[in-house]
Structure formats: structure tokens, C-alpha cells
A protein has these predicted regions:
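Polybasic, low-complexity RNA-engagement segments
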Residues: 1-150
Length: 150
């Protein structure tokens, strides 16, 4: 069963650490660990404690999800957009109320900006991630969180 297998994680291998460092630098006192393909930020002082805890208890989640490295590209996790960290790996685009609501509904809307990943914010509050492509916009807001009626 899922409860018989402890949460497995390792420190990020050097190659992946170099790829991540080229895109994003974690705040001081944080390390990056890897669980399957997912990158997770964990306070340095918690690492050895988490090793002990996971050996004796079922751990469902630890730290804050940063995202997944796909080659030299970081596909950011929604947790990172929701964090209070000042520095993000990609540029933030401020949107108006209508575009913010469209984003939260996962509805189509137009957004001007350079091609690539961006965080979306409304009134300086980050909402999530989009990827601007030449002819469309991919919305990475969690589907289960979307606004259905407003």
C-alpha cells in the first residue's frame, strides 16, 4: 500500500543542480531535494531531521514544491507562485481584474509579453503560471481550483 513505502528523497544531483542554478536561485538557508522528478525546497536545518522522521513515520509531503526540470527548462510548480518569496525564476506580469478572473477560471484571454514562462499577478499578488507561446497562452492554474461561477 502507499503507506508502506516511505517518502523517498535525495539531494539534487550536480547536473540538475547546475541546470536549476542557471534558472533560479533558492533563498538563503534552503536546499533543493528531489522526490521522483519533482524539485522541493527545504530549509537546510530540517534536512537531517526529515531523514530521521521519514524513517519512522509516513510522510506525505515536505518542503515546498519548486517544479520539474525538463532538460534545461524549469516547469514551475504552483506552490512556488503561491510562496511569499520575492525572487521568482521568471518575469511577473501584472494583469487587470478581468484578466485575473479569466486566469482563475482557466478561460481564454490575451496577454502581451515575451514568449516563455511568466507568473501572473493581480494587485501584486501572484496567482499562478502561464506559458506564452507564439499563437496562444497555456494556463497552468490548477484545474481543480478554478472558479466555475462568478
Amino acid at each position: 500500500s502507499q503507506f508502506s513505502t516511505p517518502f523517498q528523497f535525495t539531494l539534487l544531483p550536480k547536473k540538475e543542480a547546475a541546470n536549476l542554478a542557471a534558472i533560479y536561485t533558492l533563498p538563503e538557508q534552503f536546499i533543493c531535494i528531489q522526490h521522483a522528478e519533482e524539485l522541493i525546497a527545504l530549509p537546510m536545518h530540517c534536512y537531517s531531521d526529515m531523514q530521521t522522521i521519514r524513517a519512522h513515520l509516513y510522510v506525505k509531503k515536505i518542503g515546498m514544491r519548486i517544479g520539474v526540470l525538463k532538460g534545461s527548462d524549469l516547469v514551475p510548480a504552483h506552490d512556488l507562485a503561491m510562496s511569499q518569496w520575492d525572487k521568482m525564476p521568471y518575469e511577473t506580469i501584472e494583469v487587470d481584474l478581468n484578466d485575473a478572473l479569466q486566469f482563475l477560471r482557466r478561460a481564454d484571454f490575451k496577454l502581451n509579453g515575451p514568449k516563455g514562462w511568466h507568473s501572473i499577478s493581480y494587485m501584486n499578488c501572484r496567482l499562478g503560471w502561464v506559458k506564452i507561446l507564439p499563437n496562444r497562452l497555456n494556463n497552468y492554474y490548477p484545474n481543480t481550483w478554478r472558479i466555475l461561477n462568478y
